[in-house]
């Protein structure tokens, strides 16, 4: 791969991994319009590793709060919906009182509930991915499928936001039945063009959560999903990585990671200002472009 190809594809992966617009729908465009060949396993591993590092770094405070709340801490812990670093409960009793009175408080019980929700929501996509990965690669990788999924799930996102997600609940997702529903929806993202973040935000919105809560859960949910995808790629196709240039891999990882981090950082604030409908319109236009290419 030349440097231009690395930069463009890594940027596409990083920018679209956490936006509700389908990374696969965008990654197929260069190959169709510019005749680029498949980027190879090493590149896929690099960009996925970059996006995983991005979400881990951005939500490091939230993850630390969840884990400290779940293991051995009796007092309430502050959990910011936007991925902030939280408040050290040992600083002052007044801080604890203030945080406890806020809506962004998580107890040890709630920390365990949210961790369990993330686990439950991960199970469907892991199981179905292991069982049907080959079939999906064989029958659902075509441009037709990507175009229809981009359009259909984009319109569904618009319906969810219009009728449920704009003014929904802002509390963290701690109901296991809701987590399972979101997890089942996430499994649909195995179909290229669906958008993992898009379909999970859609499901959470239909369940009555607002965009900030839906996006936060979706982004946290990406951690086990991307980790699992990386492990699967390495376990089944590691021989394909032999001889790849380390500088190309590091460049792809860095570009994808930085662009993914910036996307996460700006997404919720952007949606609060412009809503989700611009993303819906964008998906419709993207689908139209894909249909025109077919």
What is each of the regions a protein language model found here?
Residues 1-294:
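Multi-pass membrane proteins that catalyze or facilitate reactions on polyprenyl-/lipid-phosphate substrates
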């Amino acid at each position: 791969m030349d440097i231009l190809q690395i930069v463009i594809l890594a940027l596409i992966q990083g920018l679209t991994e956490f936006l509700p617009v389908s990374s696969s729908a965008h990654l197929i465009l260069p190959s169709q319009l510019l005749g680029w060949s498949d980027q190879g396993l090493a590149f896929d591993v690099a960009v996925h590793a970059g996006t995983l590092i991005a979400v881990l770094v951005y939500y490091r405070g939230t993850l630390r709060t969840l884990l400290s709340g779940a293991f051995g801490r009796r007092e309430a812990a502050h959990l910011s919906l936007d991925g902030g670093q939280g408040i050290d409960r040992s600083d002052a009793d007044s801080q604890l009182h203030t945080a406890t009175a806020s809506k962004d408080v998580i107890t040890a019980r709630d920390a365990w509930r949210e961790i369990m929700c993330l686990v439950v929501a991960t199970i469907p996509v892991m199981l179905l991915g292991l069982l049907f990965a080959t079939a999906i690669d064989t029958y659902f990788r075509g441009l037709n499928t990507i175009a229809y999924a981009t359009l259909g799930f984009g319109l569904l996102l618009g319906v969810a936001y219009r009728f449920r997600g704009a003014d929904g609940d802002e509390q963290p997702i701690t109901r296991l039945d809701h987590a399972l529903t979101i997890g089942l929806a996430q499994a649909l993202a195995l179909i290229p063009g669906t958008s993992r973040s898009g379909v999970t935000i859609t499901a959470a919105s239909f369940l009555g959560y607002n965009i900030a809560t839906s996006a936060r859960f979706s982004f946290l949910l990406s951690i086990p999903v991307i980790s699992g995808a990386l492990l699967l790629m390495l376990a089944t196709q590691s021989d394909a990585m032999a001889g790849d240039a380390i500088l190309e891999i590091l460049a792809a990882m860095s570009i994808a990671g930085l662009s993914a981090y910036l996307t996460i950082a700006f997404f919720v604030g952007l949606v609060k200002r412009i809503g989700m409908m611009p993303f819906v319109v964008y998906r419709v236009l993207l689908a139209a472009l894909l249909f025109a290419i077919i």
